[in-house]
Every structure is written in C-alpha cells, then in structure tokens.
C-alpha cells in the first residue's frame, strides 16, 4: 500500500451520509448519542450523564484511536448538515468487532445499514481478514443490520455482561474477507 494512503478512519460518502472522524467540536453531538438510555440499552457502557463524561469518552474511544496507524471509528452524519447522529466502528483487536449506534429519532430509516455497508467495504479494501459482531438476542433489529452488511449468524452464547453485570444471550455474526473461508 502507498504510505500516504490513510488507513485511519478515512472519510466515506454514501447516498445520504458522510462518515468521518469525530472532532473535538462534536462533543455535544456525541453526548446526544450517548446520553439516551434507550440507544445505550444494548451497549457495553452506561448512558453518559454530562459533557465532562463525554469528553473523557471521546478522548479514550476516539482521539486515542485516531493516533493509531489503522483504526475505523466513524461519526455517522447526514450529508445535509454533517452533524453526527450516530457512530460505526470496527476494532483493530483480534476479533475486529463491528459496532454501531444511532440516535433514536433516526432509527428505522436504513441509516445504520447504509453506514455499516460502507465501512465493511472500506475494511475489506484495507485488508482486514474478517469482522465479527454480536447483538443481544432481545435486540433483533441490530442483527438485521449485521445481515444487511453481509454478515452470517454463527452461534449464540451467554455471558455475564460487564460493566452492567447481568446475563445476556449474545448472537455472534462473522463476515470473512479472505478467500477460501
């Protein structure tokens, strides 16, 4: 690959969306996504209480990743205003975990699927061997997004979920990019 090629959250445009890095001046937008109890019900953190918590979350989960040679940690923005309404990410750790979240008022419009498909294409192009994703069995719409992105259901497992500390049945999906798998 060309050394100048950006493998850290390169901007992607789709029909309706701009997928880009979260910026420091997006803290308020990030807070709107992360404060909603319903949006965060099935995510591995509690909804955030204030801007200070959001700044810390941004520093740990976005700014730190943007310093790495390769990362995929996107703000989902509508093309109209380029204002973050959600996020989509693929981790660089071994499982290459694929995840997303969207403000409630933007649910049921195919936005998570549109953003997810675009990021899946990007990580495939950039040479990731596969991605995985899990969803709580009680959140089947998240599984619909995984399927829309081409992922295949593998199995269900139970886990005492942290930090929320209750038993969850997770459905695990995977999508392999390398040939012969």
Regions found by a protein language model. Name each.
Residues 1-41, 73-181:
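Acyl-donor (CoA/ACP) binding surface of acyl/acetyltransferases
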Residues 34, 43, 65-67:
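Hydrophobic residues in alpha-helical segments
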Residues 38-60:
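Conserved GNAT-fold acetyl-CoA-binding loop/helix
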Residues 53, 59-62, 126, 169-171:
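Juxtamembrane helix-loop transition sites at the ends of transmembrane segments
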Residues 61-75:
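A short helix-loop-beta-strand connector motif used in the catalytic cores of GNAT acetyltransferases and
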